[in-house]
């Protein structure tokens, strides 16, 4: 997530962690689900995962998380509590959607770190599948509760983590500014960090762009224009799966229209732009 990609805009208090389960092809068969970016995973007859399948042999994400993965996390947390009894750190475990959340609280100061642990199957050196719910509208005859989503987190981390290293550019700065603006503007509440990151990946794929710090203002406007176009067209293509997946699929068209209108107002009105660019003294560098 943002912490590992150096895109966090405030102190880190939440992290997502993929917990990789390496079973291999002898225990798991990958099956087409008819939905781009999602698969069905079938346990072989000799697989240890037979306890977590449906009548057709497909691994049920919620069953695996609730009956096995949650137990592993509980045991690990209890072992840590026993080993470090008397510590000022308190650990608690909760269910959080498809993840198991571990809260780590420093009782001496009240600070808390929440870690979402997501069970993940690695089926090849580059293919990872996570237990994340499907929220789209693609027609399919399969049971959505059986779907596993392909994760591109490691590819995204590789692209984003050190992207300013060679030219000391302003890419990270641009994304941090945009994320802060979107968080402060209630109009853009439906835009997630992943939406903003995806627009950036599309924008940054143009190798002709100059990213020296003095270009921050121009890059900001161009990025916002690309985001506006996506909102106005009700379509944001997945960076890795391209046109086969629209990341705005689960956002109502009226909401997208309202966000596009607000974005247009920010881009066309200097006063509105100054109002939203109150970002830790960075306003002048992007005007």
Where are these regions (language model features)?
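Non-catalytic helical "accessory" subdomain of NTase-fold nucleotidyltransferases
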Residues: 1-287
């Amino acid at each position: 997530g943002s912490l590992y990609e150096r895109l966090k805009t405030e102190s880190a208090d939440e992290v997502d962690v993929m917990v990789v389960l390496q079973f291999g092809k002898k225990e798991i068969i990958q099956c087409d689900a008819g939905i781009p970016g999602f698969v069905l995973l079938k346990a072989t007859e000799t697989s240890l995962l037979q306890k977590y399948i449906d009548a057709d042999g497909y691994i049920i994400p919620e069953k695996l998380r609730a009956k096995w993965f949650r137990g592993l996390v509980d045991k690990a947390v209890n072992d840590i509590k026993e080993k470090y009894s008397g510590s000022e750190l308190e650990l608690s475990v909760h269910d959080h959607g498809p993840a198991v959340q571990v809260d780590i609280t420093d009782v001496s100061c009240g600070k808390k770190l929440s870690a979402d642990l997501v069970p993940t199957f690695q089926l090849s050196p580059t293919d990872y599948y996570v237990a994340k719910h499907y929220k789209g509208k693609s027609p399919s005859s399969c049971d959505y509760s059986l779907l596993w989503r392909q994760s591109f987190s490691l590819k995204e981390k590789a692209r984003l983590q050190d992207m300013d290293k060679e030219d000391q550019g302003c890419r990270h700065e641009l994304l941090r500014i945009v994320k802060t603006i979107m968080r402060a503007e209630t109009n853009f509440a439906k835009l997630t960090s992943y939406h903003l990151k995806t627009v950036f990946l599309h924008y940054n794929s143009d190798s002709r762009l100059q990213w020296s710090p003095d270009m921050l203002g121009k890059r900001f406007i161009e990025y916002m224009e690309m985001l506006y176009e996506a909102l106005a067209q009700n379509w944001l293509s997945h960076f890795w799966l391209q046109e086969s997946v629209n990341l705005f699929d689960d956002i109502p068209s009226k909401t997208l229209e309202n966000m596009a209108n607000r974005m247009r107002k920010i881009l066309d009105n200097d006063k509105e732009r100054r109002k939203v660019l109150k970002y830790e003294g960075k306003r002048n560098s992007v005007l």
